């Protein structure tokens, strides 16, 4: 019995550790998240747009920093201290979802940032058109371009990342990743 219990404890420990490796954040990030969620909990705001504006106001003093998601191996990066255009939108949208904990927030963020929620560099939604398409399929965003007067669709051809792998440390020297990016771009 003691052996079985020891194996179960070891299995739990290593499983937990493996999951923890795919998430990168600081204590400041989790505390900020909880502060935002607590504020929303005490709010009477039911309208999604008002909720997003309320969340976005928490980020007014945060600096713009590029490339905060880059690193090996690929992890779900939660950085609520520094943001770029896309990570700001992702953070606001994820915090505006019906989430009540840091774990809920990270799951919402993972779903927004990665194709089918798979945390891999080649499954990250690098292109904004791809991000809009994937999150539109899930009903999280809506492309209203066709509803705007005078708007015309533009042909879309994605190939920059697979054509310039030397510009991306995660692609440089990884032909299998470049091949996957080429598949993603062609889809």
Model region roles, listed by residue range:
Residues 1, 22-29, 101, 157:
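Serine/threonine-rich low-complexity intrinsically disordered regions
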Residues 1-24:
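Bacterial Sec-dependent N-terminal signal peptides
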Residues 7-10, 47, 96:
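Functionally constrained cores in energy, signaling, and assembly domains
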Residues 13-15, 33, 161:
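Compositionally biased, low-structure terminal segments
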Residues 22-87:
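Cationic-aromatic interfacial patches
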Residues 62-187:
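Acidic/His-rich structured neighborhood in mature extracellular/periplasmic domains
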